[in-house]
Every structure is written in structure tokens, then in C-alpha cells.
């Protein structure tokens, strides 16, 4: 039987070098070149020890080759987390977050995020860079539409609904992805 995840993480961290820990904090971008003939070149660019990839192409061969490299060529075989900016849908496109907030229907947003999670997971995505919870204080800011507006309470209600939709009750479920609240304080 496998050790509980906390013990596995503690064990890995105790064996990692400083360089390996730093590489785990790195995130590469790949997959914007949709030419399947370049998959080998794309894979060569990615260090086996990195923690995550922004995964734009969602090509299963590319994903599998990069993951194989991480598992077989890194010293500890730590898998890569594949992330995608699915801020208002993945294959099915929904209104932007500001439009979602205008619905005053967080349950609907939760359902949309659950569908987004299912579609993203089927394409090999583990993690979305959503929801954006910056409170819009200045309408001139170019990313106002990615958030839920100017009211902190509304932002919180819709962000919570989004996270429930993406992650559900069981993060190990095959139709769920990790959510990532963004950005740092003061960005919006």
C-alpha cells in the first residue's frame, strides 16, 4: 500500500536538492506551435524537473511525451502539472466573468465551471488559472472583464462558486481540475 500523500510529499521534499525545489517552482509555456512535426523539438525544450507547464496546444502526444520525460529523466520522477487559462470555458465558451456576475446566479457559474473542468481534464489539463478575484477599482484597467466586478462580496460569492465547480468535492475525480485564485493583492 502507498503511504499517505502527506508522507510522500515530506519524503520527496527531504530528498530534493535546492535546485530541484527551484525547478519545481518554474512553469514553462509550450504548445503554441500546432505543427505535430515539431513535437520532439517542443519536448527537448522542457527540463524534466520543472513543476508545471502552461499547456496551450492540448495535444495528447505532446503532453504524454513531456510527462514521460519528467517521470523517466528526472531524478525523483515527479510528474508535471499541466495548466491552462480556462477563465470562461474550455471547449464550450461561456460569458466572461464580469458577464457571469451580471447573471446574479452563482449556481449557474458553478455548473459552467464543472463543465469546463470536465472538458479540460479530458484534454489533459490538471489546473486552471481561474477564477480571477481582483476587485475592479478603475474601469480603465485592461483586465476588468476577467473578474466579477467592483464589489468584494460579489467577487467572493462567484469565486467560491467557480472553485466548487472546478474542484468539486473530490479532487482525485477524473472530471475535476485544480483552481487557482489570481492575482496578487493590488493587481486590480
Task: Give the positions of each predicted feature.
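Glycoside hydrolase catalytic-domain context in secreted enzymes
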Residues: 1-188
